[in-house]
Amino acid sequence: MTLVQDRPTVTTNIATIKQWVTAMAKGDLDHAPYAEDAELSDPNGKYKGKAQILQSFKVWKTAFPKATAEVTNQIAQGDHVATEVVYKAIHTGPLVASSGTIPPTNKPIELKVMLVSAFRDGLIVRERAYFDRAGLMQQLGITIPPKP
C-alpha cells in the first residue's frame, strides 16, 4: 500500500482514539472500540478481552466520576496510534487498588497518560497505557512506603 492509501485508515484510527478518550472520561463505555480479544496493559496490570478492559475502566470511573480528558498530541503510522492525554478529575469515589481500596480524598488530580494503540479492522486489539502511578498516589495524599 502507498502512503496515500493508508491515510484514510490512519485518519480514522486517530479519530477513533480521540472520540473514545473523550467518551471514556465521561463514563460512556457503550461504544468502546476494542475487539473482543483485545489486550490492555497499564501500570496496574494486564487485561485480556474487552470485558476485562471495560471493567478496569469502570474502576476508574467509580473513583473519578466527573473526569475530563484532553488529547494533547497524536502520532500515527499504519495501524498504530500514539496518543498523549491529560485527564483531570476529583477523587470522589472509592478507588480499588492492588493494595486495597482507597476511600475518596476529594482531591483533584491531573494525570498525563501515553496510549500506544494497535488496530485491526477499525478496532483496538492491543493497547499499552503509561502513566505515573506513584505521582497519582502523591496527588491523592497517599504515601507508598519504599520496598525493603
Segments the model singles out, each with a brief description of its role:
Residues M1-P148:
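C-terminal and inter-domain tail/linker signature
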